């Protein structure tokens, strides 16, 4: 944690909706003139797509049906913590990109499912923004969460998360339902041990809850819409959160606990704008003071 070089971390499982959250933050950064270094969590996988598929096949032949992208053996946890620590201390570090699809790959002139070369973060960034699977991960040897100034969890109820993953992987990646279900089953031990515990270390959690029947996510024809859901927003430290203001600004919102506000699904982006803009500006003001710069006009 560093006033001079703040870090915002958004963490969530595959299919949780972290990418949509990132788009909202990018909009805030543009509006406020903030230079953010965006870090894609997938770039800290240890193996590229082809290598990982080969490892999964080899593990299956040896009777291991639980090798996944969620656990420490297939990720660069130490390097991720080193990035967070180093950026907090100096505002610098090394990053790379993971090329998810053919469009990304074409821009970089290499195959999809591979990594770009490591590059140094420019010297003029205002903050680091991480979005991925492990933004609050902690093991016996690493603790990424402790380096983040603002840590956000995006965690739909699990049936909804599975519906979103099924639809994304089938529509955008061409997988069959059976292949996606196999992936969900294979990842379950690492999901329980490395993904779920992160949401107890976050500062704010967003949990989308559908109001339609999702009892069997594997036969769902549609992803429940925003209007068919609520978003449960939990604050780990509610002191300083202006709940009366949020309730007045977000129609049909209500509080279910002293540290939880519930908003209609269609108001999630508005809620994020109202909640995080003041937090980001506070981080930027602290950065200016630490650097001896004048305050915002």
Language model features by range: what are they?
Residues 21-22:
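Post-Walker A alpha-helix
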Residues 14:
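The conserved Walker
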Residues 11, 131:
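Residues at the beta-strand->loop junction immediately N-terminal to the Walker
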Residues 1-5:
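Phosphate-binding P-loop
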């Amino acid at each position: 944690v560093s006033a001079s070089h703040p870090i915002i971390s958004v963490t969530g499982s595959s299919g949780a909706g972290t990418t949509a959250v990132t788009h909202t933050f990018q909009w805030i950064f543009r509006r406020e003139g903030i230079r953010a270094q965006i870090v894609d969590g997938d770039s800290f996988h240890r193996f590229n797509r082809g290598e990982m598929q080969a490892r999964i096949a080899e593990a299956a032949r040896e009777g291991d049906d639980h090798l996944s992208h969620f656990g420490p053996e297939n990720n660069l946890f130490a390097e991720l913590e080193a990035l967070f620590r180093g950026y907090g201390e100096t505002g610098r570090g090394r990053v790379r990109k993971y090329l998810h699809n053919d469009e990304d790959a074409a821009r970089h002139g290499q195959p999809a499912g591979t990594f770009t070369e490591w590059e140094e973060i420019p010297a003029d960034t205002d903050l680091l923004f991480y979005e991925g699977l492990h933004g609050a991960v902690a093991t016996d040897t690493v603790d990424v969460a402790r380096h983040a100034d603002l840590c956000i969890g995006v965690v739909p109820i699990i049936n909804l998360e599975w519906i979103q993953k099924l639809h994304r992987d089938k529509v955008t990646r061409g997988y069959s339902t059976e292949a996606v279900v196999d992936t969900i089953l294979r990842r379950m031990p690492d999901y329980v041990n490395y993904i779920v515990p992160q949401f107890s270390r976050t500062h704010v959690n967003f949990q989308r809850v559908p109001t339609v029947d999702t009892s069997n996510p594997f036969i769902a024809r549609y992803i429940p819409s925003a209007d068919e859901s609520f978003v449960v927003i939990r604050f780990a430290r509610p002191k300083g959160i202006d709940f009366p203001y949020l309730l007045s600004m977000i129609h049909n919102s209500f509080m279910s606990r002293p540290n939880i506000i519930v908003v209609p699904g269609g108001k999630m982006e508005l809620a994020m704008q109202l909640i995080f803009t003041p937090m980001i500006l506070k981080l930027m003001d602290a950065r200016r003071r630490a650097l001896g710069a004048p305050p915002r006009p």
